[in-house]
């Protein structure tokens, strides 16, 4: 079966924003105007299509990135039907993993900002993720109908806070309750949408007289930016020739694709204004899959494969390649693997190669997802985003490809968890189900870890924040019927060293009969944080330790890394070289060398100036000025380091770095200090050394445990 929509008419886009910028409402309007939904679902009624998990409907926030497909031919039916695959991503910082994996497979992003709140801390996190994967983006300033809405202030914040180059292609006509429409700065026309039919029809009109000068100024700005990017247009401009709308749009599109500018539009999704023009901008300015070269996405490619795959996005005849970007559990069909096809095509029943795990897999059924509804399809082509049922051993970030042309696509980085809690099943019946449920959830979410503490025998779960863990425990109850008692949150400390040491380790038991003999010399040195957390080097010369015992040496070290030495926390950023030692013809064994390495590492670690590291959070507190003194005093008591303050519409925003261990219970304290008028956001920033007076308390707490 040939493809229905030419690939040039595809747009794979994400919709991204901070909490409450109106992201899900905007997506609902897109689905309404493109004819997917015949009735608009409102978030505050708990009926939004894209928020399909029970917890999302209760809390009114988006947790998982739902995928859906719609078609758009333009506000005035001026385009051929374009297929838009939309991924709606969460705005809460605990779910950054969802944003990260969406960014990896998208071609373009619509960033939504609130016209009142402007650029929020979470917007900056999402922006950094989009920069990392070089995703072209346009902005939509939403909620123009709200009290305090100010479009040009948000444009300025995009410039200052995100260090971007925003270029408005629209101006708002009026604001707050007087917001009536927008000015199209390319056409230089006013657009008004018909409220009687929920904004389906619209009219072009003349720009209001009082706005002509402002519109002319911003139109000129837009033309100059478009002209600077093209020698041909520059000549026309200097010769005072007329530059057509199409030429301006083509030049702006190229600048967006190169990530040089961010085009800005505005509207009010709730009042059905501006979303239709935003869809036109998606088609006119964001990339098709053919605008993104697959070769930039590759990790390990030999020259011959680059030839096969080069610009192969535009061709279904090229070898198949796809990236699995999300695993979800479905109550009816089991595992769903969401994947993005970069080249070629695949049909249900085809055999493909998982090049990361070096295993073959067979595609079972292939489904097109619309939020949580499924439509079964026979095949998918380059540019498609779909889900497969029946892939057994695929995890997030794996590449699926043609067995004859193996390729590995660029992988994703996942953050390490910063907070952990102990969970124990309430009944014996829950015990077995809990293990199954936790494994399923960990499979879906690479930023969620599960393990059993060897000393206490407790099951520990770790994630990106309290809300993250709360929702996972809630899902365990709803989806798997498991009731669990949850302990107090614990900080995920780490241990490391400051200096290099050399240390000998011996394990000798010789008391008649076969003995045990293992003898090693290790060099233990600190590594730069941020890369690999552990490296093992074999520097043995002349066979003083036979090769077959070296994996046991590595294992002995790794067991110590896991259990920690100073205070029982995992050890990171160390490089260990085994450079000397000896063995016994009869008595040496793997067990003896494992124990010798373990002894050497433990003693060496304590001599290498060990330190504890703790997660430091980037916190932003928004507070009315009257409470500034109390809030800052409290943050200082929590070992906070203040980075700066900025004015916002309701008072001040304080930026501060605070250790996670000091932030438990902060929400309640902040509420009581400010009579509920302040709010804060928090995200993981880095690991940093724990001050010596605090280290002692942590070590003592570990020993009593």
UniProtKB/Swiss-Prot annotation:
Quote the subcellular location field of this record.
Cytoplasm
Q: What is a single cellular component term in the Gene Ontology annotation?
A: cytoplasm
CDD domains per record: EF-G, EFG_III, EFG_mtEFG1_IV, EFG_mtEFG_C, EFG_mtEFG_II
One family name in Pfam for this protein: GTP_EFTU_D2
**One annotated GO biological process:** ribosome disassembly
Question: What are the entry keywords?
Answer: Cytoplasm, Elongation factor, GTP-binding, Nucleotide-binding, Protein biosynthesis
Q: Which domain of life is it from?
A: Bacteria
Q: Which residues bind GTP?
A: 17-24, 88-92, 142-145
The tr-type G domain covers 8-290
Annotated GO molecular function terms are: GTP binding; GTPase activity; guanosine tetraphosphate binding; translation elongation factor activity
Main location group: cytoplasm
Q: Which PANTHER family match?
A: RIBOSOME-RELEASING FACTOR 2, MITOCHONDRIAL, TRANSLATION ELONGATION FACTOR G-RELATED
The record's family statement is: Belongs to the TRAFAC class translation factor GTPase superfamily. Classic translation factor GTPase family. EF-G/EF-2 subfamily.
Sum up the protein's function in the record's words. Answer: Catalyzes the GTP-dependent ribosomal translocation step during translation elongation. During this step, the ribosome changes from the pre-translocational (PRE) to the post-translocational (POST) state as the newly formed A-site-bound peptidyl-tRNA and P-site-bound deacylated tRNA move to the P and E sites, respectively. Catalyzes the coordinated movement of the two tRNA molecules, the mRNA and conformational changes in the ribosome.
Question: What is the name of the protein in this document?
Answer: Elongation factor G
- Source organism (scientific name): Baumannia cicadellinicola subsp. Homalodisca coagulata
